[in-house]
Amino acid sequence: MTNTRKSHPLIKIVNHSFIDLPAPSNISAWWNFGSLLGVCLGLQILTGLFLAMHYTADTTTAFSSVTHICRDVNYGWLIRYMHANGASMFFIFLYFHIGRGIYYGSYTFMDTWNIGVLLLFAVMATAFMGYVLPWGQMSFWGATVITNLLSAIPYIGPTLVEWIWGGFSVDKATLTRFFAFHFILPFIITAMVMIHLLFLHETGSNNPSGMNSDSDKIPFHPYYTIKDILGILFMMITLMSLVMFTPDLLGDPDNYTPANPLNTPPHIKPEWYFLFAYAILRSIPNKLGGVLALVFSILILMLFPILHSSKQRSMSFRPLSQCLMWMLVANLLILTWIGGQPVEHPFITIGQLASVTYFFTILILMPSTALMENKLLKW
């Protein structure tokens, strides 16, 4: 008789995805982030569900309902800070996951890569709307500034902004709809993750060498299940250390002041994981230009498969491309730092230089260096 694991219509899907899945024998810890992102998503949905049980999406009570969660609900503080810091962990892993994809040339799986970029957009939208919900100063002004950017769209812009707001300013209608979208999007993200995995399992995983690994596969379970569990353990240690010792380390103190439309905070800035994009947005003096640069700074990821000009897939054996890759990482860290600084000299100039370097590295330097490496290897 056939094993239930292999014959049951539902269980066999799980079996082919997580148990009997043939995986390359040499994938490193950089391949752990996919499963960590899955755990993060589950954790966010779970903690978010419990928060939604006590939260009220109304401008008069939203702030005090969050206070009530932290003070009066059993372990409410724990759930709230796990959700807030869980989002930070989510983005750390997302950026590592994308960085791994760029370094090892995983973007050549175009279907998987493109759905991944769409996933990034969906997660960013979810995080942005979630940040608005506590209705603190930074929530309100962040929502006002970012939604206002859409007014830069020619002809339909101003109407579109008022349509999103549900009025003539960020108010009760905006908060209610943001809560609704923030609740539904993670489930849409979960569906997209399944499509992401479906496309990945059509081709199988990439590996550090970038070569075909069909001749050397091992079963996912127990080898990579145990490896993933170790990764999850490290993640939980980091997350719980953050939550227990410095829960507000990554947050903004301004968000502990209830939203006040009559008083603007001294420095309006998003959460740390959006600062690099915010810096690119601010580095262009024109509103529409800034918005286009902001969108393109993420959308540029979709160009990686087209711009790939090397005869090798991975950067493992390409020292010059490796240098550029780490230059890009350093560049993004500089942009993140600039995004959190006030708009004054010398930060404006540094931000503009870093923004230009970001696009120049991806669009010009990386493809031309890859071509040069081909020449050096007489290909």
Swiss-Prot record:
Cellular component, GO annotation: mitochondrial inner membrane; respiratory chain complex III
Which InterPro entries does the protein's record reference? Answer: Cyt_b/b6_C, Cyt_b/b6_C_sf, Cyt_b/b6_N, Cytb/b6-like_sf, Cytochrome_b, Cytochrome_b_C_euk/bac, Cytochrome_b_N_euk/bac, Di-haem_cyt_TM
GO biological process entries: mitochondrial electron transport, ubiquinol to cytochrome c
Disulfide links within the chain: none
Localization in the cell: Mitochondrion inner membrane
Give the bilayer topology.
Answer: Multi-pass membrane protein
Annotated TM spans: 33-53, 77-98, 113-133, 178-198, 226-246, 288-308, 320-340, 347-367
Where it mainly occurs, coarsely classed, is: mitochondrion
Tell me which Gene3D superfamilies the record gives: Cytochrome Bc1 Complex, Chain C (1.20.810.10)
Q: Which cofactor does it need?
A: heme b
Superkingdom of this entry's organism? Eukaryota
Q: What does this protein do?
A: Component of the ubiquinol-cytochrome c reductase complex (complex III or cytochrome b-c1 complex) that is part of the mitochondrial respiratory chain. The b-c1 complex mediates electron transfer from ubiquinol to cytochrome c. Contributes to the generation of a proton gradient across the mitochondrial membrane that is then used for ATP synthesis.
- Other facts noted in the record for this chain: Heme 1 (or BL or b562) is low-potential and absorbs at about 562 nm, and heme 2 (or BH or b566) is high-potential and absorbs at about 566 nm.
How is the quaternary structure described?
A: The cytochrome bc1 complex contains 11 subunits: 3 respiratory subunits (MT-CYB, CYC1 and UQCRFS1), 2 core proteins (UQCRC1 and UQCRC2) and 6 low-molecular weight proteins (UQCRH/QCR6, UQCRB/QCR7, UQCRQ/QCR8, UQCR10/QCR9, UQCR11/QCR10 and a cleavage product of UQCRFS1). This cytochrome bc1 complex then forms a dimer.
Its recorded name reads Cytochrome b
Species of provenance: Ctenomys mendocinus (Mendoza tuco-tuco)
